[in-house]
Amino acid sequence: MDGFIGDTTALLARTPELLRTLLIGLPQAWTDTPDTADGWRPRDVVGHLITGEQTDWMVRTRRILEHGTSVAFDRFERFAMLERDAGVPLDELVERFARLRNANLAALRELITDADLERRGLHPSLGEVSLRELLATWAVHDLDHIGQIYAGLAGSHDAEVGPWREYLGILLRREDPAAVAG
């Protein structure tokens, strides 16, 4: 198997345990703050990751393998979690995500080979994309949202850090993405 597939799935396999370690059992006061003023709380991010597991990554992988570029991917409902997951405890969302991710990675390992990586699909707004690009995006998408979760957790104590705020880039970037800690 291409090192790319093994390396990418190894990273993807770590996300459920990272989320368990980071979020399960934390008080709601830590998890109710969005990463930016109009951003997502950690629970929203986990819900968004669940949506990806249900309707995006493996669905698009199968679409590439079965149809190539002849059938475009469905659009991704980025905000589906807001209504679907209202009132669901965060710990339950983390466990739901873990089950879905583990099942998807098991299916992925059975489904693709190195030879499939350059096969192409059709994204509704980006045009043609390769399976390799889709899988790389899946992994980087995790990293992007893990950073978002950390920013939300840090934001829950924004006021409490007092004058040290000017040294904490994770807090400064909540208001100005280009900010660098002092």
What is each model feature region?
Residues 24-31, 109-118, 155-158:
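Surface-exposed helix-capping loop/turn segments at secondary-structure junctions
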Residues 32-76, 105, 121-182:
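Short, contiguous alpha-helical
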Residues 4-14, 37, 96, 126, ...:
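Short, contiguous, pocket-lining structural segments
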Residues 15, 78-119, 129, 133-141, ...:
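Acidic/histidine-rich alpha-helical segments that form the ligand environment
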